[in-house]
Curated annotation (Swiss-Prot):
It comes from Cryptosporiopsis sp. (strain 8999). Anthrone oxygenase; part of the gene cluster that mediates the biosynthesis of the dimeric xanthones cryptosporioptides. The pathway begins with the synthesis of atrochrysone thioester by the polyketide synthase dmx-nrPKS. The atrochrysone carboxyl ACP thioesterase dmxR1 then breaks the thioester bond and releases the atrochrysone carboxylic acid from dmx-nrPKS. Atrochrysone carboxylic acid is decarboxylated by the decarboxylase dmxR15, and oxidized by the anthrone oxygenase dmxR16 to yield emodin. Emodin is then reduced to emodin hydroquinone by the oxidoreductase dmxR7. It catalyses: emodin anthrone + O2 = emodin + H2O + H(+). This is Anthrone oxygenase dmxR16. The chain crosses the membrane at residues 21-41, 67-87, 96-116, 145-165. Belongs to the anthrone oxygenase family.
Amino acid sequence: MAPQTKRAAETPKLGVQKAAVIAAAFLSAITAGAMANISMISVPVFMDTNTNPNHMIAQWSRTYHYGHIILPGICVGTCGLYAFSALRSNKNWRRYALAGITTLSLVPFTWVFMTPTNNTLFALEAAGNVSDLGYVQQLVVKWTWLHATRSMFPLIGAILGFTGIMADLER
């Protein structure tokens, strides 16, 4: 009779902390992808198909609205998972803390760099009958570049989280 191998001893233990990091890194990547989609697909469609500045502002406003409902909550939850992981990790706590801070950094980036453009677009929407398509396009393109830059924060957080979990699993 052949001896039974202990498969459980060969498989690295996942645990709650590592599962939290995997979830956080996954959520960071999903957030980055959703944000990049807006800049790389949605807004270019607005630019290619709109000839009416009021319609373009309305589309931008609705895109902002739905993104604002979903993405900040995911970002905060992701940061919480990274914080939990940092507190529970012995060796990679700095990497997990940095992943959380990096992911959450999109919030101050938004306040500092994007709020003026957002406010201008919202003011144009509230004013109603806007006639300068070129000006609206210029604002939307500026917002798109800022938004694409902002989407890098959760992407970097995801990379830090994934590299941290890979380092943990190697030990």
